[in-house]
UniProtKB/Swiss-Prot annotation:
It comes from the Bacteria. One or more lysine residues are methylated. CDD domains: Ribosomal_L11. Keywords: Methylation, Ribonucleoprotein, Ribosomal protein, RNA-binding, rRNA-binding. NCBIfam families: L11_bact. Gene3D superfamilies: Ribosomal protein L11, C-terminal domain, Ribosomal protein L11/L12, N-terminal domain. Forms part of the ribosomal stalk which helps the ribosome interact with GTP-bound translation factors. Part of the ribosomal stalk of the 50S ribosomal subunit. Interacts with L10 and the large rRNA to form the base of the stalk. L10 forms an elongated spine to which L12 dimers bind in a sequential fashion forming a multimeric L10(L12)X complex. This is Large ribosomal subunit protein uL11. InterPro entries: Ribosomal_uL11 (IPR000911), Ribosomal_uL11_bac-typ (IPR006519), Ribosomal_uL11_C (IPR020783), Ribosomal_uL11_C_sf (IPR036769), Ribosomal_uL11_CS (IPR020785), Ribosomal_uL11_N (IPR020784), Ribosomal_uL11_N_sf (IPR036796). HAMAP family: Ribosomal_uL11. The keyword Ligase does not apply. PROSITE patterns: RIBOSOMAL_L11 (PS00359). The gene is rplK.
Amino acid sequence: MAKKVTAVIKLALPAGKATPAPPVGPALGAHGVNIMAFCKEYNERTKDQVGLVIPVEITVYEDRSFTFILKTPPTAVLIKKALGIETASGVPNKQKVGKLTDAQVEEIAKIKMPDLNANDLEAAKRMVRGTARSMGVDVE
């Protein structure tokens, strides 16, 4: 028989740097999850992606055990990494912060494909271009 799910918690944590401090501790502690076990496992599974923010969906069961699914990093984080910038534009229509090539857009779209509700790569590329434009990034 399947275990009964008591909660689904969504967090966005820096890869390889999860600690029991907020936001992890309070979110998991409220459901009686072993916080250190989660932190160790999360850090182990994300150690090759250090520097990125990785969203995670934690499913907590009735017996206080848990499983978690790692998602792909947010599109904005991947765009900032590709351009080597810290922050996006505060006024995206007037102030541009960089240019993204079509090859970079395609690479980001391929990374994001499992989490997007796009049917093909072209649709995924359009989503990435839209995110880039809203960040003040020109797309060539």
